[in-house]
Regions:
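Conserved HGGG/HGGXW glycine-rich cap/lid loop of the alpha/beta-hydrolase fold
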Residues: 11-66
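Conserved hydrolase catalytic core segment
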Residues: 89-133
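Catalytic active-site module of serine/aspartate enzymes centered on a nucleophile-bearing elbow/loop
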Residues: 248-279
Length: 279
């Protein structure tokens, strides 16, 4: 799949990414927060069968700026800036995991720029978003011999005290937990982390959850939620969020984990096709 790179100026630094494919326009938002965007390549490739898809590295890591306030408002403004830079008046928005949470905020904040929104296995927008259940399940799926180490590293990371090496080790210990069948997980991709982006955005996520939950009923753009039946993120996190949005729908993909396109190839494209057809 041929990629055309782009770099877009914002009020604070530049954002870099690439675009490929042909068809209705989709902007893909990666997870994290504070994580590199390369893991999303296979998802973008699946969507590229029917769509022109752009994706970009969120601020905090190269090749985008490493500087920022690392707030929800800034992240939503960055989505609008990328759309501006691409010359896209409107586009469909697809977000995964943390990105799947961010797209709820985008649907509230910049609805005039969005043709529709697909949230994929997200941190939800009701209650704590499923965060506590997700964290517990991630640790429960780690082999017992490594569980105490994984827990200790997670606590350091949450406190903002983990070194880059410890953050990488922590992710490697829980990598299998993202999948429906952890022993069969694929090799871990190359990962990078921005601690300032992670800490700043998680703090703002937690602070703004009540406000976001209260705003769900005001969302007017076409909205779909796709979740994995066997994801460590409880499917209810996404499903209950969709139930609060007028006209929204949700789909639980049987046998899929957090990276739904890996264990159920084609389900992401089918969900986007449904969103576009409904819109």
């Amino acid at each position: 799949m041929e990629r055309t790179p782009f770099t877009i100026a914002t009020g604070c630094g530049e954002l870099s990414g690439w675009v490929s494919g042909a068809g209705p326009r989709v902007l893909a938002i990666h997870g994290g927060p504070g994580m590199n965007f390369g893991y999303l390549d296979d998802a973008v490739a699946e969507l590229g069968a029917h769509y022109q898809v752009a994706t970009f590295q969120q601020r905090g890591l190269a090749p985008s700026t490493e500087q920022g306030e690392f707030t929800i408002a800034e992240a939503v403004a960055d989505i609008a800036a990328v759309l501006d830079g691409l010359g896209w008046d409107t586009a469909y928005l697809m977000g995964h995991s943390w990105g799947g949470h961010l797209v709820f905020h985008a649907a509230v904040g910049i609805p005039e720029r969005l043709a529709g929104v697909l949230s994929v296995d997200p941190l939800g927008a009701v209650g704590d978003g499923g965060a506590a259940a997700f964290g517990a399940e991630m640790l429960a799926r780690v082999p017992e011999a490594s569980r105490d180490r994984a827990r200790a590293l997670d606590e350091k990371d949450t406190a903002g005290e983990a070194t880059p090496e410890e953050a990488h080790e922590a992710f490697s210990l829980v990598w299998g937990s993202y999948f429906a069948h952890p022993p069969a997980a694929p090799p871990m991709p190359h990962v990078e982390f921005s601690q300032p982006a992670n800490l700043g955005l998680w703090t703002d996520v937690t602070t703004r959850l009540p406000e976001l939950e209260a705003s769900l009923a005001s969302i007017t753009v076409p909205f779909g939620v796709l979740v994995g039946e066997l994801s460590p993120m409880p499917p209810s996190a996404g499903v209950e969020s969709a139930e609060r949005i007028p006209g929204a729908w949700s789909h639980i993909e049987p046998g899929a984990g957090h990276f739904v396109w890996h264990e159920a190839p084609g389900c992401l494209l089918a969900a986007m096709d449904r969103l576009v057809a409904d819109a």
